């Protein structure tokens, strides 16, 4: 019989948009990493509408690279976005796709937006994360 090293507890941070994890939950996320948690980073939407200088495809690619760099900087595993900007809706297909990520990560702690927020996308992300 071989002994296995127990996997550290995991935390999954789910933001609505690229940079939401950094702006809204990075401090807590980093402290949990320092406390021994395995960190997992995800933006639900890809940031394709986040630029006035670049088209949607290029903007999404830029935002993906920025998010990957942010995740790497704090030692988090990056999980790709599931939807385009303006497509964060509380529906069964999106909840099922997010649930697959949550099941894969199996976090002890899930960080996301509050249920009452200044942006509808944030509220929908919260509902999806809680459902998942």
Predicted regions and their residues:
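Active-site-adjacent beta-strand anchor residues
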Residues: 14, 112, 119
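Active-site rim/loop-helix segments in enzyme catalytic domains that contact anionic ligands
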Residues: 1-105
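Proline-aspartate-enriched helix->loop->beta-strand connector
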Residues: 94, 98-116, 125-126
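Short Gly/Thr/Asp-enriched flexible loops that form oxyanion-binding sites at enzyme active sites
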Residues: 120-132
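Acidic, metal-coordinating catalytic cores used for nucleic-acid/nucleotide bond scission
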Residues: 87-88, 115-122
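Hydrophobic/aromatic pocket-lining and membrane-interface residues
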Residues: 67, 110, 129
């Amino acid at each position: 019989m071989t002994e296995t090293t127990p996997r550290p507890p995991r935390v999954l941070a789910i933001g609505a948009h690229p940079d939401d994890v950094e702006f809204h939950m990075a401090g807590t996320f980093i402290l949990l990493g320092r406390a021994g948690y395995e960190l997992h980073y995800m933006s639900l939407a890809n940031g394709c509408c986040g630029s006035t200088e670049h088209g949607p495809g290029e903007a999404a690619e830029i935002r993906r690279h920025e998010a990957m760099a942010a995740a790497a900087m704090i030692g988090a595993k990056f999980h790709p976005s599931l939807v385009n900007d303006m497509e964060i809706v509380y529906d069964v297909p999106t909840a099922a796709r997010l649930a697959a990520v949550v099941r894969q990560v199996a976090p002890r702690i899930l960080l996301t937006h509050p249920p009452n927020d200044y942006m509808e996308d944030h509220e929908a992300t919260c509902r999806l994360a809680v459902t998942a």
